[in-house]
Amino acid sequence: MTTEEAAAQYGADSIKVLKGLDAVRKRPGMYIGDTDDGSGLHHMVYEVVDNAIDEALAGHATKVQVILNADGSVTVTDDGRGIPVDMHEGEGVSAAEVIMTQLHAGGKFDQNSYKVSGGLHGVGVSVVNALSDWLELLIHRNGKVHQMRFERGDAVTSLKVTGDSPVRTEGPKAGETLTGTEVTFFPSKDTFAFIEFDRKTLEHRLRELAFLNSGVTIWFKDHRDVEPWEEKLFYEGGIEAFVRHLDKAKTPLLKAPIAVKGVKDKVEIDLALWWNDSYHEQMLCFTNNIPQRDGGTHLSAFRAALTRIITSYAESSGILKKEKVSLGGEDSREGLTCVLSVKVPDPKFSSQTKDKLVSSEVRPAVEGLVSEGLSTWFEEHPNEAKAIVTKIAEAAAAREAARKARELTRRKSALDITSLPGKLADCSERDPAKSEIFIVEGDSAGGSAKQARNRDNQAVLPLRGKILNVERARFDKMLSSDQIGTLITALGAGIGRDDFNPDKVRYHKIVLMTDADVDGAHIRTLLLTFFYRQMPELIERGYIYIAQPPLYKASKGKSSRYLKDDAEMDAFLVDEGVDGAELDLASGERMTGQDLLALVQTCRSAKANIDRLAARAPATAIEQAALSGLLGESPNAAAAATRLDLYAEEGDGPWSGERGDTGFVFSRVRRGVSERVVLDDVLLHAADARRLAERAVKLTEIFSGRAIFRRKDKSTTVRGPLDLVNAVLDAGRKGLTIQRYKGLGEMNPDQLWETTLDAEARTLLQVRVNHADDADDMFSRLMGDLVEPRREFIQENALDAEVDV
């Protein structure tokens, strides 16, 4: 079937209705995922993007654009066929309205419209509509622009033609009339715990889609910041380029990834695999562009074929005989990075989250194609094949050595009744769910922790010095490390693929407690590397935590208080600074106590907005512009200029303001020298400017003129939020002695209990992995053998580093 024929058949009669959106609003988690942790929020974008990608899979689209708008909404555009706009016979309204308002409506139920698809078209976009405060739909089809608006899932305007579609100016269809769909939506605050999109989370998924669909260009833009950001995601190499991207911080054993492509029994397979010199496997599986975290029939088929082909080659080449080892499946996958993508007409998954593929017809197709492709490659590349199999044989030898070491340890443990490490101060509680273990840096801190702990349910394990970097060590070498052996024994869950059992771990809270200096951060990173590489299930189950000892101790007279970080320190200084203070406003009103504290909190939020915008203009100019209403809906340049005069000193001329081509321009003469300030449109449309404008509505009346802040015998002139925050913080510091902690050893047992061990008062950070491939890349870059990726990381993040010297 040609593209033209397919386009002709995709009309109103392609849309099948199966009804109702109320269920979505009542039980959003069933349709979109968790509405509290951000996964459901980002899934809203994925649902719309998946529709655009499905157009690309069907051969009708080449470009997708995702924009995070300054007002918090998202726009997704594609240059596909455009949603059908003709009337739907069964529903009596346009097909576009059916798709957007009926739960089970779409073109994915009709094999003529889409051969394969990631999800059910109408389900996804109608759910997005139901869970949005508003959604605007723009369709280019039949040479016309069609527009429609929805609020809370209901149409508030009918689909109407608003103009003619423009002509394409670039790409393979240049000169033709533009077709495509644009969806802009604002997620509902009533449904989601927060509605701010995370750029990195979206970028990760969009990059995956660009790799999996070579030839499709995805433009990702973020217009929320002062400096607009954009990235073009386009990879001609497809999943071969994906594997290279995943392995960019590792040393490859082959010049290029092995690629296997083919179609068998309507199952399309696209595979790329590449061995490197690391000791860890990285495997990503996709079905119709959807990732399977738990694998499934495609993964088991690939592994079976890989093990069979490699074992066969190792035997026929004589390498097995020479090395005197027997190969296992895990040996073949040591140092392997692989991306496996299958396209299946009607995939079946084990659950609604689609984390595991269970379609039985996929297994023989994948196994057959992989066996055939790998056999051919091994025959055509004998030297590289030999290098791979030699590495695998070495892995098998190391595995055997590690097995013998474990057997010795087991026998020793069986004979030794007190097999727990001598340094471990264990707890009396035997229920793992109630037990905690603190892994402490050094013997001195370990001694304090042992005295401070609650012996009923808190164990302490001090580790001296830096533990082995397991990223650069093979399994047998790792087992020979005393510190790692101590850690493994204390946890009681075993180690290695065959012996590790997370159900046997003796503590369900494993807390890393290191100093707040560079050495402490390094030791914590080494421990995290160990847990991520050797016991990832403990991270997945949420058992690993990082202790947050206080950073500061603030003392005044005989009283003292511990403060965990800079934010808590600032909050404490504000409380101190407001205590006994008063603010006399220009209106004659006086603010004190809770009213003043609430005002200062609002001013701190406004200051945070101003600080982020200050890269483009002076902070005081932004502040006074906001207070004049310049960032709101009715900007007045003259009013903003008048407010700027509050900062004028003797000899300064008055400010004047006007609207220029690219923003507002303010100028004055200061001691004979012309001065000019520009608040450009980029700043005016930034998300922080919008939030600042909302806060300024409340602040404008309070700061109508110069105010006076008084505390004890000192008074300060206040012209806006910036002056007030600085005056309060200065007042709060007066008479305080502030001590900064760097090591746990600096605290005595009582202090350690009060700040870090007491479950009622402490702060713990739970370690979680959102994207395994990103985590894998980060550990490889920072902890691996290659120096260049580490240098690049330092250069990229140097400005964000906070280093205590």
Swiss-Prot record:
Pfam family membership, one: HATPase_c
Major location (coarse): cytoplasm
EC number per UniProt: 5.6.2.2
Domain Toprim span(s) in chain numbering: 435-550
Top-level class of the enzyme under EC nomenclature: isomerase
Binding, Mg(2+) 2: D515, D517
UniProt cross-references to InterPro entries, sorted A to Z: DNA_gyrase_B_C, GyrB, GyrB_hook, HATPase_C_sf, Ribosomal_Su5_D2-typ_SF, Ribsml_uS5_D2-typ_fold_subgr, Topo_IIA, Topo_IIA-like_dom_sf
Source taxon at top rank: Bacteria
GO biological process terms held by the UniProt record: DNA topological change; DNA-templated DNA replication
Cofactor note: Binds two Mg(2+) per subunit. The magnesium ions form salt bridges with both the protein and the DNA. Can also accept other divalent metal cations, such as Mn(2+) or Ca(2+).
NCBIfam families per the UniProt record, alphabetical: gyrB, PRK05644.1, PRK14939.1
Family: Belongs to the type II topoisomerase GyrB family.
Note in the entry: Few gyrases are as efficient as E.coli at forming negative supercoils. Not all organisms have 2 type II topoisomerases; in organisms with a single type II topoisomerase this enzyme also has to decatenate newly replicated chromosomes. This protein may be 16 amino acids longer at the N-terminus, in which case it would overlap with the stop codon for recF, the upstream gene, with which is might be translationally coupled.
Protein name, entry field: DNA gyrase subunit B
